[in-house]
């Protein structure tokens, strides 16, 4: 379901020279709609130079009644991120979709777990909400955070992490690794990669002891970290990844599929609508938007899963998937931004969000 609401910006706080935290006020009538699992994201919508842009940003703080916060780091060529950093101010209103996303962890107060977070740069944003919420909700659990940055000056949430360490001195272990800052310990200098994790395992950490691991950052770091954790004894199904970007600069679509003239039925908000694909349509989502459908989407790159739907009839080809879990694929879920029909009379259901 595509559900945007106009939310007022309560405050904008600088985190580094390039990053800000934007906190939205959530009225009492919408607090249930904006309840979230730590690790999820919000999709923000704005018109810039006459063009509607949508971008996903991770929720970066634990749940607090009446507000919800995301962090935005301005990137080179990032129209929306630079707009967010430079122009969004307290008192403005923005269109904000209700929380989405598969990534994250829902704490269980009776659980006693040892969790690992590996983040680089802005990859810390979903981790902060997960770590803060888990340590508060699970009094017998502990968290180890490995956080990579160029330097301490580029480190997002430096003070918040220090405060968490002060609050949970025996339950939070924070390892900061800097690539461009000289440190006393060579172990904490460099980049987070497979070699670094293996070095940490030899002298500091037993990775096989962790019950769950959460990874977010550049694609190469994430892939290296995942491979290393499996080699160091962590089960594959205990490792959870959140990708902000696709590994390549060019989004791949199911372009080899000949879908010109195919009909697809969209089920949304309990209603069916038929669309007809043309040769120019790169995906079901592309065709639907061209024909005026108001479907949920954000990245269009197979990363955020905002456009997830379930195939009820027929078969589709999905070119790229960086977000759906194996059980979702087995249940028939696809990303509409990456899918084209293979058979006639395909039906896809955008109301089927039960596995999110």
Segments the model singles out, each with a brief description of its role:
Residues 289-291, 296, 306-355:
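Iron-sulfur (Fe-S) cluster-binding segments and ferredoxin-like electron-carrier domains
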Residues 2-93, 97, 110-113, 149-151, ...:
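Ferredoxin-reductase
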């Amino acid at each position: 379901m595509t559900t945007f609401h106009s939310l007022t910006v309560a405050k904008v706080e600088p985190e580094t020279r390039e990053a800000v935290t934007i906190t939205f006020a959530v009225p009492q009538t919408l607090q249930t709609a904006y309840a979230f699992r730590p690790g999820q994201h919000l999709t923000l919508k704005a018109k810039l130079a006459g063009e509607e842009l949508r971008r996903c940003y991770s929720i970066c703080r634990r749940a607090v009644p009446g507000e919800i916060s995301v962090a935005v780091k301005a990137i080179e060529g990032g129209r929306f991120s630079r707009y967010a950093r430079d122009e969004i101010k307290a008192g403005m209103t923005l269109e904000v979709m209700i929380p989405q996303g598969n990534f994250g962890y829902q704490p269980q107060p009776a659980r006693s777990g040892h969790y690992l977070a590996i983040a680089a740069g802005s990859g810390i944003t979903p981790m902060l909400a997960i770590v803060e919420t888990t340590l508060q909700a699970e009094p017998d659990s502990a968290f180890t955070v490995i956080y990579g940055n160029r330097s301490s000056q580029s480190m997002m949430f430096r003070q918040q992490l220090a405060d968490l360490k002060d609050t949970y001195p025996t339950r939070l272990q924070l390892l900061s690794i800097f690539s461009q800052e000289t440190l006393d310990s060579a172990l904490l200098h460099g980049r987070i990669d497979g070699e670094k994790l293996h070095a940490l395992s030899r002298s500091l950490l037993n990775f096989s002891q962790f019950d769950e691991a959460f990874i977010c950052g550049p694609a190469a770091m994430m892939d290296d970290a995942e491979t290393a954790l499996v080699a160091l004894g962590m089960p594959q199904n205990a490792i959870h990844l959140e990708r902000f970007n696709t590994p390549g600069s060019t989004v791949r679509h199911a372009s080899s599929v000949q879908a010109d003239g195919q009909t697809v039925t969209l089920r949304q908000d309990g209603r069916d609508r038929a669309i007809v694909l043309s040769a120019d349509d790169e995906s079901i989502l592309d065709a639907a938007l061209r024909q005026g459908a108001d479907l949920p989407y954000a990245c269009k790159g197979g990363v955020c899963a905002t456009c997830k739907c379930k195939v009820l009839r027929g078969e589709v080809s999905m070119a790229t998937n960086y977000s759906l879990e194996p059980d979702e694929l087995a249940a028939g879920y696809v990303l509409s931004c990456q899918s084209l029909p293979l058979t006639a009379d395909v039906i896809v259901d955008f109301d089927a969000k039960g596995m999110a």
